[in-house]
Swiss-Prot record:
Entry keywords, A to Z: Disulfide bond, Endosome, G-protein coupled receptor, Glycoprotein, Membrane, Receptor, Transducer, Transmembrane, Transmembrane helix
Positions in the Cytoplasmic compartment: 85-95, 154-166, 229-244, 309-336
Name by which UniProt lists this protein: Atypical chemokine receptor 1
GN (gene name): ACKR1
GO cellular component, one term: membrane
Membrane spanning stretches: 64-84, 96-116, 130-153, 167-187, 208-228, 245-265, 288-308
Amino acid sequence: MGNCLHQAELSPSTENSSQLNLEDLWDFPYNGNDSFPEINYDASLEAAAPCYSCNLLDDSSLPFFILASVLGILASSTVLFMLFRPLFRWQLCPGWPVLAQLAVGSALFSIVVPILAPGLGNTRSSALCSLGYCVWYGSAFAQALLLGCHASLGPKLGAGQVPGLTLGLTVGLWGAAALLTVPITLASGASDGLCTPIYSTELKALQATHTVACFAIFVLLPLGLFGAKGVKKALGMGPGPWMTILWIWFIFWWPHGVVLGLDFLVRSKLLLLPTCLAQQVLDLLLNLAEALTIVHCVATPLLLALFCHQATRTLLPSLPLPERWSSPVDTLGSKS
């Protein structure tokens, strides 16, 4: 953020020096052998100096952005190929159309990572940056909502128990994700060649809406799933949300939602940081949380592959041999 949002306070030595200037020195007799009291100017300058934070994701981090983007695109493309490959066992995964959409969301995120990366010169326009943030957060919101539905509905997604559910989920969840990206799309642009959110009084409402959306989707949603799982298990009301390895996805976005909320409170002066060090720690956490979100585009396809491998390894031995090969085709027909 650049500067600490607290007022600089003078040290006791500085306050004493000011009193000497105003009171004692007025009537202080001067002769050639006497000297004026020493004033600690260094303490005053240090207290009034602005607080600067070093950006962890500066121009030197461009290779990290590019590497994550390339690996994410390759991994997501591989998972999509396996999911749509005819007569392949991954099509037996419960809710594989939802899993395919997760891979699509990860691929979209990977594609826009270089657009928002620093160190690519000053050629990016505000429109391109706004589009980049729209896809960046839109794909993340869609993945989080898809994971929530996959956990809530569980095997129903793959058993054909709810006709037309896949199409309804696709339209509804991606539409909701697109609406949630409107605030950050309008409150972002290019500054000195870098894509960045725009913080101003006029756009404060948009930034607040975006912060609330991130906190609700990335923080409250996984906490709600865990809470529902625990409550239902404790009360004996059923298994609750379907807990799988895919829930690890939220680890990559949960810190971002928390730190983004803290940063907004500080910018709005609803939360005052006592020291410059606290401000620098918050800025560092913002950069680390952003780096963790970038890593998710590589981790998500790996989680999908591991989930499909575990699901098919458990499911295939329980199916008769002819049904093992007919099930993917039947699944495709029932979902179309």
